[in-house]
Amino acid sequence: MARISGIDIPREKRVEVALTYIYGIGLTRAQSILEKSGVNPDIRVKDLEDSDIQKLRAVTEEFTLEGDLRRQEGMALKRLQDIGCVRGRRHRMSLPVRGQRTRTNARTRRGARKTVAGRKK
């Protein structure tokens, strides 16, 4: 297995797809990385030369990936919560952040239904 950015990428897949196994690299970014490094996107990872792997490592080092990216995203959410803005409060309460309705729907974000006992008459 080839190791890029501390991740073992699968040997049997095309390089273009295998790069997407790294957190922070999607298909578009994988294509741009391959274009910059001059590696053929249709080749399988197991058929890559060592020089090709070195080129890919050099290009991927320019990006924030894996743990650093996760930490950056977490700190951004924490900052929103600390300053007390609406987005931060919505994140803290596990509610939809971008203006979606919550009277109905939003089940994924709010979690399973909690039954509330009806009032006695």
UniProtKB/Swiss-Prot annotation:
<dbReference type="GO" id="GO:0019843">
    <property type="term" value="F:rRNA binding"/>
</dbReference>
<dbReference type="GO" id="GO:0003735">
    <property type="term" value="F:structural constituent of ribosome"/>
</dbReference>
<dbReference type="GO" id="GO:0000049">
    <property type="term" value="F:tRNA binding"/>
</dbReference>
<keyword id="KW-0699">rRNA-binding</keyword>
<dbReference type="InterPro" id="IPR027437">
    <property type="entry name" value="Rbsml_uS13_C"/>
</dbReference>
<comment type="similarity">
    <text>Belongs to the universal ribosomal protein uS13 family.</text>
</comment>
<dbReference type="GO" id="GO:0006412">
    <property type="term" value="P:translation"/>
</dbReference>
<dbReference type="GO" id="GO:0015935">
    <property type="term" value="C:small ribosomal subunit"/>
</dbReference>
<protein>
    <recommendedName>
        <fullName>Small ribosomal subunit protein uS13</fullName>
    </recommendedName>
</protein>
<feature type="region of interest" description="Disordered">
    <location>
        <begin position="97"/>
        <end position="121"/>
    </location>
</feature>
<keyword id="KW-0687">Ribonucleoprotein</keyword>
<keyword id="KW-0689">Ribosomal protein</keyword>
<dbReference type="InterPro" id="IPR001892">
    <property type="entry name" value="Ribosomal_uS13"/>
</dbReference>
<comment type="subunit">
    <text>Part of the 30S ribosomal subunit. Forms a loose heterodimer with protein S19. Forms two bridges to the 50S subunit in the 70S ribosome.</text>
</comment>
<dbReference type="InterPro" id="IPR018269">
    <property type="entry name" value="Ribosomal_uS13_CS"/>
</dbReference>
<keyword id="KW-0694">RNA-binding</keyword>
<keyword id="KW-0820">tRNA-binding</keyword>
<dbReference type="Pfam" id="PF00416">
    <property type="entry name" value="Ribosomal_S13"/>
</dbReference>
<dbReference type="InterPro" id="IPR019980">
    <property type="entry name" value="Ribosomal_uS13_bac-type"/>
</dbReference>
<dbReference type="InterPro" id="IPR010979">
    <property type="entry name" value="Ribosomal_uS13-like_H2TH"/>
</dbReference>
<comment type="function">
    <text>Located at the top of the head of the 30S subunit, it contacts several helices of the 16S rRNA. In the 70S ribosome it contacts the 23S rRNA (bridge B1a) and protein L5 of the 50S subunit (bridge B1b), connecting the 2 subunits; these bridges are implicated in subunit movement. Contacts the tRNAs in the A and P-sites.</text>
</comment>
<feature type="compositionally biased region" description="Basic residues">
    <location>
        <begin position="100"/>
        <end position="121"/>
    </location>
</feature>
<dbReference type="GO" id="GO:0005829">
    <property type="term" value="C:cytosol"/>
</dbReference>
